[in-house]
Every structure is written in C-alpha cells, then in structure tokens.
Amino acid sequence: TALLIQISTEVGAITSQSDKETVRKLKMIGHYIGMSFQIIDDVLDFTSTEKKLGKPVGSDLLNGHITLPILLEMRKNPDFKLKIEQLRRDSERKEFEECIQIIRKSDSIDEAKAVSSKYLSKALNLISELPDGHPKSLLLSLTKKMGSRNT
C-alpha cells in the first residue's frame, strides 16, 4: 500500500514536470501517507466489524499476515508471541479468536495508531513545504481525511 501511494505521488510530480526537490518531497509524502494508511488498515482489522470491513475481523491474522499491532504485542507479551508462533493455517478458529481478543484488549492498538499519526505528521510537514495552490490544498485535505479514517 505504501509503495503504491508513493509511486502515485512521485509519478504525478514527474508527469507535471515538477522540479527534483518537489518530486522528492511528493515521493516521501506518498510514502508517509501510504504507511499511515496501511497501519490504520491493520488496526481496523481488529477494531472494526465484519460488516464495515467486508471481511472477517482478524482476517489478516487468519491469512498468516503479521501486522504492526501483532508485532507490537509480540514484542512485549512472550505468551502472545508463543501463541502466534504456534498458529497454523489449519489451527482451530478459537485459537485465532484468542489472539484477536488479546490484541483488542491490549494497548498495541493505540501504539499502532500513534505510529500511524507520526507518519501522517511527517506527510503534513512536507506538504506544508510545497508551494501554495489548489494541488497543495487538495493533498492537505486528503491527508487529514486519512487521519480520521474508520473504515
């Protein structure tokens, strides 16, 4: 996700014939926005509902993806780390549910949101360095909207 958004902002800057410094800034803005977006997506995988997500809660874990909230919890909770290491695709659903509930009840969700916010802040700082105009205000608006994303 981060790479896709990064490439999009970079290619947009190149095709609009921006100078090298603006291309570099827009590339980094895309990277930071993409990282923030992906982390929020990882958080929503635990905090949202199946109806809102359009997929089962915890589907990243069910599919074997170790996301930031999981990594953060593994780092501070050895029992949880062991549970994750023992999970297999054919593990019983209740084993996955246990891990999902541990994440939901932990502060790893808030920690991941804080990391996402840091990336968003870096993007906003770089956006503030861009020349004033309609493209800048659109990018600023989009970035702020991403920070309040809940689906």
Per-range role (PLM):
Residues 1-151:
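All-alpha prenyltransferase/terpene-synthase fold signal
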